[in-house]
Amino acid sequence: MPGRDSVWKEQTIANTSEQQFRVEFECEFLGSVDTLISSAKLKSLVYDEPIQSNRGLDIYFEPIKNHDYVITVDVARGVGIDYSAFVITDITSFPHKVIGKYKNNEIKPMLFPSIIVDIAKAYNNAFILCEVNDIGDQVASIIQYDLEYDNLLLCSMRGRAGQIVGQGFSGKKTQLGVKMSKTVKKVGCSNLKTLIEDEKVIFNDYDIISELTTFIQKHNSFEAEEGCNDDLAMCLVIYLSLIHI
């Protein structure tokens, strides 16, 4: 196309991102590599403008009385590389609906918990599930002990049964969230593929769609293509590791 040469491409990517460029200008890229979600499904996904947008938080639907929500959290160190993120999902009935998301690569782990809890309280005291492999354990600890939020989901280690998610656990084998083991990720990715392609999980967020276009197979797992991010995709994996299908 006239004017759209390599210099234009470099400038466009510099002003947006590699992921955004591929979604908007290289439609043939969708599913052209080993993406978790099929290319046909990726091409059918559309995004809407959020009804609220503020400092990384995008909201698509207001809370509905008596609906059940879960917030799944992936935590970064807040040094501008990876993003701290969470996804808010209405799990009242199928199809589940992603109604909001947060994504920020500068928020410090000490400040992140208050943002999570404020949103959780607004959405009918939503359940919160954190990934606690690294700095996420610190975030979950603040939510549990400092902010004393009642609906933080815990995990109990049960040997061969793996991690059991729920509330009211105690003892040495209890964690303040889920550890992203190979098994948990495998289940979450499998469910993510099945439920999105069967339209049992619905979302209209630009960043989530963008991440899924570069969420590809590497060895026996899935992760972001080099130079891209998968923080929101992993929030979906965390949430869908809870679902039994």
Model-derived segments and spans:
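Short, solvent-exposed coil/turn linker segments
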Residues: 1-2, 38
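Generic signal for short, ordered secondary-structure residues
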Residues: 3-4, 171, 214
